[in-house]
Amino acid sequence: MKVTKGLQISAVVTASVLLAAACSSSKKTASTTPSSAAPAATTSAAAAPTSAAAAPTTAAPATSAGAPAAGGGLIGVDYPRSDSDFWNAYIRYIPQMATTLGATIKTTASGNDITKLNANADSLVAEGAKALVLAPQDTAGIIPELAKLASKNIPVVTIDTEPDSGKVFMIVRADNKAYGTKSCNYIGTQLKGVGNVVEFEGDLASVNGRDRSTAFGACMSANFPKIKVFAEPTKWDTPTAIGQLNTVLAGNKIQGLYMQASIYLSATLADLSSKGLLKPAGTAGHIVMVSNDGVKAEFTAIQAGSLDATIDQPADLYAKYGLYYAQQALAGKTFSLGPTDHNSNIVTAADGDLEDQLPASLVTIDGAYPGSVKSTDPSLWGNQSG
């Protein structure tokens, strides 16, 4: 596989590229404008929380989150951003899952601003939160706050990202390397191993961007060496991605496109359409495209023949198991490496923390591709969220 970055040939994966996105080894993972922080809100579930267990117990594999857990106490939840369908779905699921699990929560919103996130965490603790569910977009900037929370014995569950350092009770995220590998195998198979493919990389300073990019590049090199990849770092910024796509198209015909997040979808389809390059699947000149997230707009594009596939990032399960693990932390439970009872696998993250890697399905128009799910499957959260 030949790889081009910004039209200059280079290795697909350099030694500095390790991964995360949604979306992490240093700076912020997005360059979008922060949204306004929402005031704290408290939600009391119908089932009253019970007292935390006095002595820690071991729970491995993880027990089901379908019923209220034993850990009582207020759980603080910060919403990281509201500039994508995915995160807006996560925000909607949190109070629903709190009710299901019998958790009492107080929420804040940090708008992709690490300073605001750290302040929100302090505020939530001051207002009585005994555990926190956070989704730090700046995985280096959260380190001092994690140290402060640890000194106060406040357990933290992080969603979607791994902090660069610092102790957390559990990381809840999907297997982002699988995103890159599944996307690679689908595109490579559809192209029969030959062609030019543009890759919209996320932010390589984020663990999600690194994981997806590393896995996609490794898979292409190993399995489809005749495919030339134009790996374009976008920092999760759509205008940057479209500019890079146009640069590639100025001197090349492309047969495939991998978008590491759904934020690129609408603008990409519009740009290709304006150039007469948006052809329906199954027709001559169609560009095989795979996205990542699992939002409704992707399923609609798949059914229209514009998009070929996406990887379903489980917004509903992020909310469910984020709260579940916060409850278990308050109950004094601990967890071990290995498979869980909810079709995931607990692994050791880079800094030694435990990470529950939730499954993420490949979604296609009819589910005929091996291992894929039909885009109209009602079990997909994107088909439930409106």
PLM segments and residue spans:
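Flexible loop/hinge segments that line or gate small-molecule binding clefts
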Residues: A140-A178, N196, V295-Q303, L307-D308
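Venus flytrap/periplasmic-binding-protein-like
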Residues: V157-D164, S262, L269-L307
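Hinge/cleft segment of the Venus flytrap/periplasmic-binding protein
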Residues: G71, N208, C219-N223, Y321-G386
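Hinge/beta->alpha junction and helix N-cap segments in small-molecule ligand-binding domains
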Residues: D78-R92, K106-K116, Q137-D138, T161, ...
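Short, well-structured alpha-helical segments in soluble
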Residues: K116-A129, P239-K253
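Bacterial lipoprotein signal-peptidase II cleavage site
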Residues: C23-T33
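Bacterial N-terminal signal peptides that target proteins for export
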Residues: M1-V13
